[in-house]
Amino acid sequence: MARVCEVTGKKPMTGHHVSHANNKTKRRFLPNLQRRRFWVESERRWISLRLSNEALRTIDKNGIDAVLAEMRARRDSI
C-alpha cells in the first residue's frame, strides 16, 4: 500500500542524512499517516481513510462532509 494521504496527496520525500562529518546518505521523509474512521451522517455509514495529520486538522476545521465533497470533485474514490 502506498504511503499517500487520501485527502492532501502527501507522499514520501527524499533527502539526506547528514553526519557531523557532513557525509550524506539517502533517506526518505515519510508523511505522518494515520488510519481513521469517520461517521458520515449524510450517508449514514462509516468511512475509513488513511490521512496525514494535516488532513485530520483540515477535517476538524471544515468537517468531513466538506472534505468528502472536495475529494469527489477531484474524482477520488472513497
Curated annotation (Swiss-Prot):
Keywords: Ribonucleoprotein, Ribosomal protein. One of its GO terms (cellular component) is cytosolic large ribosomal subunit. This is Large ribosomal subunit protein bL28. GO terms for molecular function: structural constituent of ribosome. It comes from Nitrosospira multiformis (strain ATCC 25196 / NCIMB 11849 / C 71). Belongs to the bacterial ribosomal protein bL28 family. HAMAP family: Ribosomal_bL28. Signal peptide: none annotated. GO terms for biological process: translation. SUPFAM superfamilies: L28p-like. The keyword Ribosomal protein applies. NCBIfam families: L28 (TIGR00009). InterPro entries: Ribosomal_bL28 (IPR026569), Ribosomal_bL28/bL31-like_sf (IPR034704), Ribosomal_bL28_bact-type (IPR001383), Ribosomal_bL28_sf (IPR037147). Coiled coil: none annotated. It comes from the Bacteria.
